[in-house]
Structures are given as structure tokens and as C-alpha cells.
């Protein structure tokens, strides 16, 4: 059930309208609408095979919808590649581990921060230090992702997702 009008894009940062995804004759996502306000965090709940991950993949640009559109700040981004959406702040924190196990914690974050052309190298370093402190992983800065506990890995994933200031 929708709690707000999907056509009211002015108050929303991200809107997905009428998303469909079909693989052959199998419909895996059927007419999904999502509206996310700036600074809002959302999750989708549902049974296995309901299309939750596929919906997030369409929003982030990992896969193209069969039908439907995605808007970010009133601009249609449906056909934008994933890297352009990421630069605009569209991100997804997957339920499966997504940090690079052979990279250090520091380099996992730097990988994203280096895409921030709006930040100087010094500002990138300050952002890195701040996020490591905020998530209590400064002491793990030089540790490889594959050596982290589940909770540490999750905190690094969240810190990395915030590198783009979504």
C-alpha cells in the first residue's frame, strides 16, 4: 500500500515507477513503485523469490528493467549506467558481503572515495578518517577485508556506502 502519491516527485529524491522485470516468460518483478526521500533508508521485506533483490538491482543499474522508469531528483536515470548512478549517490547495501576481501579496510573505502572528483585528496583523507572513526574501525585500517568478523565487515560496508554522501 502506498502512503504517498507516486506522482509527487518534488518531495522525493528517488522514485521507481511501474518497474517490471521479465526473464523469458517468467515475470519476476511486476509493477513495483518505490519512493524514497532524501536521507531515508529503506529495505524491502518479502518471501524468497519475491523480486526484492532484482528491484534493487534495477534501481542501481545492475540490470535494466523490462518496463518502468527510475527518477533521481526529477531526472530520469533509467538508462544511466551503474557508475553514473553511483556518482549521483544511488547505492545499495547487499545482504551478502560486498567488501573486497583482499583489500585493506582503508583501500575498500579509498576505492569509492577516489571517484569523488568534488573532493580534494586532503578532503578524501579527512572523509576516510571520519568514517573509520564513526564506525569504530580505525584500528582495522590495515586489515584485509577477508580477515574481518561479520560485524566488522558490515560496519566497513556501511562506511563505504556513505563515502558518496548519499
Question: What are the language-model segments listed below?
Answer:
Residues 45-47:
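The feature captures the beta-strand-to-loop junction immediately N-terminal to the Walker
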Residues 121-140:
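Conserved ABC ATPase "signature" region
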Residues 76-96, 121-122, 141-142:
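ABC ATPase NBD coupling module
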Residues 60:
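Helix-to-loop junction immediately C-terminal to a conserved catalytic motif
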Amino acid at each position: 500500500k502506498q502512503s504517498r502519491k507516486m506522482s509527487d516527485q518534488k518531495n522525493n529524491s528517488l522514485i521507481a515507477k511501474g518497474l517490471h522485470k521479465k526473464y523469458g516468460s517468467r515475470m519476476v518483478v511486476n509493477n513495483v513503485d518505490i519512493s524514497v526521500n532524501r536521507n531515508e533508508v529503506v529495505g524491502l521485506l518479502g518471501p524468497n523469490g519475491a523480486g526484492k533483490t532484482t528491484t534493487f538491482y534495477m534501481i542501481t543499474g545492475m540490470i535494466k528493467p523490462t518496463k518502468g522508469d527510475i527518477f533521481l531528483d526529477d531526472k530520469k536515470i533509467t538508462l544511466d549506467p551503474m557508475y553514473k548512478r553511483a556518482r549521483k549517490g544511488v547505492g545499495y547495501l547487499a545482504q551478502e558481503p560486498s567488501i573486497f576481501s583482499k583489500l585493506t579496510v582503508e583501500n575498500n573505502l579509498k576505492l569509492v572515495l577516489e571517484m569523488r572528483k568534488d573532493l580534494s585528496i586532503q578532503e578524501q583523507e579527512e572523509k576516510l578518517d571520519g568514517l573509520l572513526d564513526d564506525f569504530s574501525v580505525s584500528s582495522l585500517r590495515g586489515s584485509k577485508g577477508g580477515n574481518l568478523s561479520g560485524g566488522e565487515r558490515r560496519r566497513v560496508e556501511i562506511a563505504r556506502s556513505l563515502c558518496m554522501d548519499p
